[in-house]
Amino acid sequence: MTVKEKLLKVKQKFKRGDSSSDVDSGPERDRDEDDSDNESRNTSKTSKSSKKSKSGKSTGTSEMTELSDDGGSDIELLPDDGKSFGKRKLQDTDKPCTWNVLVRIIEAKDVSTGSARVRTIFDGNSKMTRTVTHAIPKWRQNILYTIKNQPLEKLAAKVLTLRLVRPTALGESSVGEFSCYLSEVIHSPDRSVIAKWVALGFPGMDDEEPDDIAYENCGFLKVTLSVYRIDESPPTLIDDDGKEQIWSGAHLIDYTLKIRVFSVEQLIRQMINERKIKKKQRFYVMVQCGAHKTETTMESAFLDEDANIASVKFEQEIYLPIQWPTVISEIIFSLFDKKGRGKTCIGKATLPMKMIYEPGETGYLPTFGPAFLNVFDCERVTRFSIFSRKMRGSQQDGSRFVGRLFIAIDCVEYMEKANAQIMHLDHSPIMEAESICKNLEWYNCFCSMSGLNMINPQFASDPVCIMMSIGSFGSTSNEFRSCNSSTLPAEPNWDGCKYFTMPWGNLRPVAEVNAPWEVIEHRIEMSNVLMKMTNMLDTMIWEVRRIGNKAIDHVSSVGMEALECLEQQIDSASKYLGRINPVSSNALDRHILDYRKEKILKLREHFEKEAFSIDYSDGEVDAKLLRMLLKIRSMTLELAEDVQMTIPPVLIKMMSHGKLIGFAKIPISEIFQSDDEAQSGEWCGRTRAINIQWPTLVDQRNRKREHVAVLHAKMWFGRTDQLTKWKEHVQPADIRRFMEMYEVQTKGLALKWKDEADIYDGKWEKTNEVPLENGWNAVGHWIVMNTRHMFVPKLGQHTVHDKAFEIQKRTEDGTWKHFKYTDCYADELKPKDLDKHAKGWEVGSWAQDKFRNNGDEKGWVYSTNGVFFGSGVLTDREEKVHHNFRKRCIKRPRKHEGYNKELEDFEHFRTTMGNENWEYSPSKKEGPYHDLEDRTDRIRRRRYVREVENKDPDSEDPRFRVYEYQMQTGKWQLRCYIMWGNDLLPVVKNSSRAFVRISFAQYSKQTLLVDNSQNPIWNETVMFKSVLIAGGTRDIMKYPPVVSVEVVGECSNNEEANLGHFETKPNVICGNTDVRGTPQWFPLKFSNGRTRGAVLACFELYSEEDKDLIPLEPKCKHNYKERSEIPTEFRPQFDKFHVQFLCWGVRNLKKHKLLAVRRPFVGLTIGDQEFTLQPLKDVRRDPNFPEPMIVFGEVILPSALELSPPLIINLFDARAFNRQPLVGSCLVSDLHKYVSHIVPKVKSDHAERWEQLDLVITEEFDQIIRMVRVPTLTTDPMVPLDWWSRYYASMSQFHRSPGYPESGMEYVRIFRRPLEQMNGYNNFSDFLDTFPFVKSMKGDFDDPEEKEKAGELKCRLLISKLKKGKPPAAINTVVDFVGPTRCLVRVYIIEANGLISNARKGRVDSYVKLHCGKQNVNLKKNYRSECCDPIFGERVDMTVTIPLEKDLKITVMGKRRILSDQEIGSTTIDLENRLLTKWRATGGLSGQFTVQGELQWRDQMTPMEILKSYCYKMMLSVPKIESRQTERGEEKGITIEKITFWFSEVLHVFENEEIAMLNSQRQKAGKENFSDGSDQQNEDVSDGSWDEEDLEREKEKLKWEKHRSKGKPLKKVTTEKAETADGELRKKAKMRIMGSQLQTIALFILRQMNLVPEHVESRPLFSDKGGRTQKGELRMFVDIFPMEYGAIPAPFNIAPRKPINYQLRIAVMDVRGAIPVKRSFAEPVSDLYVKAFINGMTKGHKTDTHFRVLDGTGEFNWRFLLNFDYNPWEKKVVAYTKNRFFCKPVEELVDPILVIELWDKNKFRKDRLLGDIELDLLDFIEGIGSPSDVGVYSTKKRQRGVKCPKCCTRRGCLCKCCIFCFETKCLCGKRKVKKKPFPKPVLFVEPEGYDDTVNIFESRNLYGWWPMLTEEYPHEEPQNAKKKNDDVGKDPKWIMGLVEMDMLLLTKQEADQEPAGKKRSEPNHSPFLEKPDRKSWANSWLVSRIKPCIKYFWHYYGLQILLWLIIIVILILTIFVLLHTWPTILAEIIKAIF
């Protein structure tokens, strides 16, 4: 049976269980659960077999109840609801990655094995856990699999198997197993299944076994499964989350994916080989969905000669199996061409799976179409087929359209077929699909190209052309190229710097494609409406990114504006979706609409939640706002996506010499024209910059430039009846069409041009006629327009225009009326002057001049005073209330009547040209052509064009070229203000030079080369003067041309290095009221979306028509006359700042050029000032600078610090020969972070008050010394209080800390994160910040982790703005320690949780290694064996010198036997920050000043001394001592900063804080809170408390309490008082152990100042191998004791609790009433022995065997000596398991249970367990005084000799007696008796007083009889079955015998003093054991069988044996006599004869 079929059976099982459980009624189910008693008891036996249920119920409820029952457990296993399963879509599942599969085995339940381990099998690898030998096996062990370079969709198809096995002598035997696909884990929330139970099925199933075997359950296994990437952290491993649920792994559902392949349409002509059409060239489609592949049948193509395309009809249906939810990322359709025996893939189409389904309860299954898929292939770029095939195989986005695949996808029920199937379609779906194909509409697509610049110099001398196509329409290739959809090939022009540009001017080429497409406008419009939100967010995200350097005000304004706009757009989109009525749509359209409506509501909720959670005053508001905007953008982008927008994208190809050199794809939706502007595409009719990418991936990876060129184009796509809107977008330009003719001449042998010329048309075909068809008319005459003619003033038309200005004035009623006309010189024109015209001209009417539109939409320019001409004119383009005059330009057409019509004749026009206007080329007819003749030229040509117009709208001719004619061309001036850069990508080591290159229109310029390429300062203005830009002024203002900026670095070999680029649009200025630009930061972008660095710049575009608008040119740079400075008005406003820099010292310096850095020094540069410190003498002795304070009194910086250059800190090393190499550098860009507005405090001098306080402190200290100390607070000597009691009590685990709440001692704070990340400590950087030095070499882009660090600088930066009369802020330099400080560092390692190892068997033999400076401490000897959650309990003392040894690194290692030890994870602590911080992190402050007991105050200073030191350092007022009289006597108080704290108030706050902390712990543990009448909560405690994750032992305690009670009601104990001793008891205890009132108040004040409390921190362990991933966490705390503070206090003893060694002596005397279960020689008989062991023992102790017991009485007199270790704190027994040689045993705490078993020994079969009893040593029943108390009576031995009844009762003859014996086969004449029956066991009934229980640790010595019980009736014979009227009750227990025992408990010391021998060995005492009173033959199995064997055979076969013996003796005697007498007889015979 396959694994898949096994999984199907398991799924059916859980489906049946789930459905039945849902049907059952609630009361019945509750009653069944309450009444049921668990038959599978929770024992500790190692060899007991599981009991099966005998209940006759068959409902699902009873089944699930039986499966979930655990002995004595109240936990109910419920099926996992799976509501979160498969609710999210998976991204990038097809990309290879390295994955970790984590399997955590927690425990097992209801398993029938003693010793067990779990073997995991995944991907062919097998790993296993350690072996445990407990009735409830617990491992808590992690197993990790690492799968490299594999996509998630392939990983999901693999099977994970968990197999529970029992180790045997020859291997292992399987108990049960669980298998699941990994996709079931992947689809779970966070790709993890946390602490769920899985059901173990019957192992070894095959096809021949019945199905019901699959439903048999073998137990449960609790596991955690997780799949995460190598760069992700594993989930939090919680072994008990309070929800006991069964995760069946059966969430996956099998479906069948139905794919209908109708046809391939619009197959391009290149794919058809005409020769093979006759041979029936065939095509087929291969469909790949995950691991399944299938192919359609081969079909022939049908060629349409008119349309020049082909189609292939398939009409087939493919069925593919699929599991749901799925991880398949896409369905791949490959189109193949069959050529003979070979086959070729000619194109592929991919369908993203995530876009055709939606997960979740409201989602839908995959569906698609019927719709088209566009098939693309990559262009052939090389002649070598091998390389071409390789490049095409790796190409992700093809550049050649192949065809359109018409398909439909649906999901149906599973067809129970594992393989794919193919069927032919019926007629009805074909007809439905054809109806969709026939619903077509004619669409037009236009692309008006205004420029193609930044062309790679590689193509400088090549003819370059642009072709456009949509699908198979347009110029698809060089062979199928049409004039109206391509440009004229031309040689690029040099742009004056580096790149090249196409010679396009006012006659812009336009590509046009007209084709029919299916009507999908409703999809495009809906997507565009939703895409508007994404586009708006993109703009806002770009604005936030380029604001730079923490400009909080600007960021806040942008953020609020973005949120307001987003809120409006969400409302609009919601209303729009509500209005949509899906009329003509398929199933996917309807599903997408419902999905969008649902998601838009969730988006609104998410927006409302996130929008109000941002604090705009936060310093990190930019990062938070950016994260929020990116998150919302991803949601809006997902909303807008629609896979059924199936019209092919616009394909723009850049060709040269017929080869593809670059391409770009433009989705139709971006340029779609709709009736509503909101539904139109973002770039519809707008000019945009399109990056032309390289044709292959090889080029994209290896080329230094990211793009081939940049195309500036205006694109439009819409219906044919919407062409008027396209013309509106083009205005004020016109669309013109031209027919073209070429006259070509060649040179002959004489090197002279031939007289004859060839005439070619636009398609380059020879012709003698003008190609003008019907429906087209020529306009104007012929003109010559060669390739390189950029600006064409005339097009051969005989029309000119007169221009004037119209001025209107506002009347009193607000209307506008005509005022006057003027000419261009402001002279007034009369109306009669406007009507005049010269003779010979035909004039038209005056109208608005759209070309000269500098105003609003109608061309008006407004003014207040009516002055529109001259200097100082103030005009505005928008109408306002105060405007009184307005002006616009008007024009009038004028035609010359003397137009020469002869020039319309082509031949005549040729003759008029002479020998001019030729363009030349060396060889090829296609060029490239140039204007000047060269001696190498062999071809020349003239290009004649003539405008044509279309009279018939239905006619078209692809031979006509289309142009956008801009009659208005103006001069413009671009000014680029390049200021400086920030944190650019380093070019090479030790930096270099950099410059900026700017490309605009047809030109490029660059700045000067400046030094320091990482933070360059250019301060230069780059001007582009008199740039001709064709187009109307308003169009340029609305859509300014794009400016491309590159930052380039200069390498040492004079090559250029790309430092990033960006594109922007300049501020267009055409009037005095236009707003000028402001400097902004522009982030530099790289490929793949990476960024690094920014440039501060500004760009302005001026119109040169009005010279007064253009500001004066800035002054020239010094020594560079051709370079200009930044104008004054653009320079940021500067202010004076006061900068303080506390340069404390350098740390962790790395080697530089293989030499250690010995004498480092630091150089600072901020603004225009520099400072250099003196080198250190020897960094190894003192790394701190002797004079660390650097003060810049006045530094001129920009007022807006976000525009400021960064603070540069360079680290140098002073070496021999005056060398000072640069070791590293650090850039501080975020100067806002270090600005301070706080006025410094003035240190007050109150010497007398400080002296008074010293006297009080001395008096308090003397009082403590005189105090009588109580060394211990322990009430129970057996359970002493220790540090672990405090630790467990602080986590609300009071069952592990008995007596601690009553002691009154304080609790400790448990932090769930590192200490420096808690309570606002901010990594303890309040005094010193850590600035990393980075080596000046080429680094990564955005990832600072990959930058190579050279060291660290400990410093403090403070910037304050200088204001008159106010002193600047100052750094508080008061610190306790200045130079190197000797300290004792005490590291307490508590425990580790969730360690993850890559070991094959998942074993972790962990230990701790510490490193600080040159000190290393290795605790390998104290490793913890095979434990993922080890308890270390280690304390390490290290004497270090801070800061020389400041980094403490704690590493958890994994011990290995042969290989080197493996590092699991490490964490690092900065000791210097903890020593110098104001939060006093040297040692945590205790919760109270405890001076009594085991855990006293452990600080070097008293609270009063600490308070004095803190107030002095923080410049606070001197604390004042107060006192007052109360009812309880004198009460002390302390006044500080005018606030008085009294002792009574402090006590009340302490109590509330303690209760709040415990409530927080209990809430996380799922318990009820304590109540003290106060609702006050401690926020810090709640935030920093540890999540309770170890509740299992507490649950076990409650479970065993119920088990011990045996069904009796538990004693009611007050939980609060039992666990916390809350109330007066604890208050009194606290008052006894606390110090004086002043010390308590001082401690309270210190804790209110947020000083570090006494704590245990949880530090994550990270491993750098294979990515920085978390490998667990470590609980620990560190104390730092400076030596100069005096004596070091005694340390805590945190060593793991040592158990107490005990010896339990059990004397087994007799056994009474043993029920035999076998027969021996027809008699019921038993071979008895007794076995005893304590839970956790690997081997039990047995007595000898009393053989052949007939009366149930066994004599033993045998002593057991059971040694065990007992943990009195947790009341557990320590179990030791050793699975490997040379390895420590594994310790585990188990319940203290003594098991006594009565066994029947079998010689040739397994021994049989008769009965047992489990005695909880803490609470078990006392022995029975007499066997008769339970109905067991001892009987006397019977006489075995029986006389014959016939002989004894009647006198008869011997003959009759013999005859009777012969008949009965009995010599004694006894009648034949029946077989003796088995004795009937006694039903166990509890005697009186049985409820009383005893504790062996209290009683110490016990004697009595204990029953051996069983729940199964021992015999199955009908005559021994219970009768119908027997009242046995529910769940009866039968007594199989009584064992007489004497138990004595001794400690190890007592046992050594009074030893006793095992068995009956000496010394034999307490009690003295004699030899058992049994027959000698009862000691051996063989001897005990001889006598009954003889008796048995004599009884049944004695007469036969006797008769046969007599006969044999007679025969022998006869033969003997004959032998002796034979000679005599023979002699007598002979004599008689003779």
Swiss-Prot record:
Exclusively expressed in the testis. Residues 66-79, 1577-1591 have a biased composition (Acidic residues). Required for the fusion of the membranous organelles (MOs) with the plasma membrane, a process essential in spermiogenesis. Residues 1-1998 are cytoplasmic. Residues 1-80, 1563-1619, 1953-1972 are annotated as: Disordered. SMART domains: C2 (SM00239), DysFC (SM00694), DysFN (SM00693), FerA (SM01200), FerB (SM01201). Keywords: Developmental protein, Differentiation, Membrane, Repeat, Spermatogenesis, Transmembrane, Transmembrane helix. This is Sperm vesicle fusion protein fer-1. Belongs to the ferlin family. It is a single-pass type II membrane protein. Residues 1600-1611 have a biased composition (Basic residues). It is found in: Membrane. GO terms for cellular component: neuronal cell body membrane; organelle membrane; plasma membrane; pseudopodium membrane. The chain crosses the membrane at residues 1999-2019. The keyword DNA-binding does not apply.
